[in-house]
């Protein structure tokens, strides 16, 4: 049976760390920031770690070779 292909959209959005956790960028920072406070915008910087169950699903279905 051939290897499963990685979903190309997922490999642009998620990264698997060395310990196996899945990280992604925060959502909600593309447009409409005029409504948000400076603190809210600042807290959307960087990456976030997904919950274990969500990360396991991402690795199983979208990033099978990671």
From Swiss-Prot:
Q: Does the keyword Ribonucleoprotein apply?
A: yes
Q: Does the keyword Ribonucleoprotein apply?
A: yes
One of the protein's GO biological processes: translation
Q: What is a single molecular function from GO for this protein?
A: structural constituent of ribosome
Provide a GO CC annotation, any one. Answer: cytosolic large ribosomal subunit
Name the InterPro entries on file: Ribosomal_bL35, Ribosomal_bL35-like, Ribosomal_bL35_CS, Ribosomal_bL35_sf
What Pfam families does this protein map onto? Ribosomal_L35p (PF01632)
Q: Which UniProt keywords apply?
A: Ribonucleoprotein, Ribosomal protein
**Which SUPFAM superfamilies does its entry note?**
L35p-like
Q: What family is reported?
A: Belongs to the bacterial ribosomal protein bL35 family.
- In its UniProt entry, what is this protein called? Large ribosomal subunit protein bL35
Species this protein is from:
Afipia carboxidovorans (strain ATCC 49405 / DSM 1227 / KCTC 32145 / OM5)
Q: In the UniProt record, what gene is named as encoding this protein? A: rpmI
């Amino acid at each position: 049976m051939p290897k499963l292909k990685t979903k190309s959209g997922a490999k642009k959005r998620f990264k698997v760390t060395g310990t196996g956790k899945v990280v992604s960028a925060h959502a909600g920072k593309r447009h409409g920031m005029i409504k948000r406070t400076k603190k809210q915008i600042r807290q959307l910087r960087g990456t976030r770690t997904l919950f274990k169950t969500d990360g396991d699903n991402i690795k199983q279905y979208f990033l099978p070779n990671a």
